[in-house]
């Protein structure tokens, strides 16, 4: 299982939100690039970077910073947030990113998702963000009619190899992941499931490994010190 340290960017700064709320922002650093270097130096094998401004506006607001992170680090970097067309996917991949996460666009623009999976194959991951079991879109501010598992099965049938599954109710709350939901998702599909949301201590990461997910994104817990990244990597 891979541990993905998360870097969320608003206004060029490294931040964390609580339950996806843009009105509840904590700034953890002025330089996302320096933060990325820190996680790499502590042994991270892959980095997860989100343009939160982009997720909300539908445009790549922090693209230059994100490409700078990818060019600075030796480890692979995946990114999402505001990627609504193939041109943006291409810009990020040519800028050094290893994997692109499609969230809202995967739900609302099926043609684009099909084209992206056909063109870029394993370099595309689908972000499935669930609120009360339903898929949330537009920076988590709206919900769709899909259940998370239904949508996952559909994108798998279209050729997706990786999904990032976030339980919004747990995100940024440090109250533990939704193990039942993660296990249900991992059992329902054969593609890689990366779990996100709620990790608050090392035990959560070990418990998630038992659900069958292939990776876990850790955000707030490594910023507050609740989880020691080096220790967590060694433990799994």
Curated annotation (Swiss-Prot):
Underlying gene: hisA
Subcellular location: Cytoplasm
Presence of the UniProt keyword Amino-acid biosynthesis in the record: yes
Iron found in the keyword field: no
GO molecular-function terms, A-Z: 1-(5-phosphoribosyl)-5-[(5-phosphoribosylamino)methylideneamino]imidazole-4-carboxamide isomerase activity
Keywords assigned by UniProt, alphabetized: Amino-acid biosynthesis, Cytoplasm, Histidine biosynthesis, Isomerase
The protein's Enzyme Commission number: 5.3.1.16
InterPro entries, per the entry: Aldolase_TIM, His_biosynth, HisA_bact_arch, Isoase_HisA-like, Isoase_HisA-like_bact, RibuloseP-bd_barrel
Name this protein carries in UniProt: 1-(5-phosphoribosyl)-5-[(5-phosphoribosylamino)methylideneamino] imidazole-4-carboxamide isomerase
Biological process terms in GO annotation: L-histidine biosynthetic process; L-tryptophan biosynthetic process
Pfam families listed in its UniProt record: His_biosynth
Family: Belongs to the HisA/HisF family.
NCBIfam families per the UniProt record, alphabetical: 1-(5-phosphoribosyl)-5-[(5-phosphoribosylamino)methylideneamino]imidazole-4-carboxamide isomerase (TIGR00007), PRK13585.1 (NF010112)
Pathway terms, separated by semicolons: Amino-acid biosynthesis; L-histidine biosynthesis; L-histidine from 5-phospho-alpha-D-ribose 1-diphosphate: step 4/9
GO CC terms: cytoplasm
Catalytic reaction list: 1-(5-phospho-beta-D-ribosyl)-5-[(5-phospho-beta-D-ribosylamino)methylideneamino]imidazole-4-carboxamide = 5-[(5-phospho-1-deoxy-D-ribulos-1-ylimino)methylamino]-1-(5-phospho-beta-D-ribosyl)imidazole-4-carboxamide
Active-site residue list: 8, 129
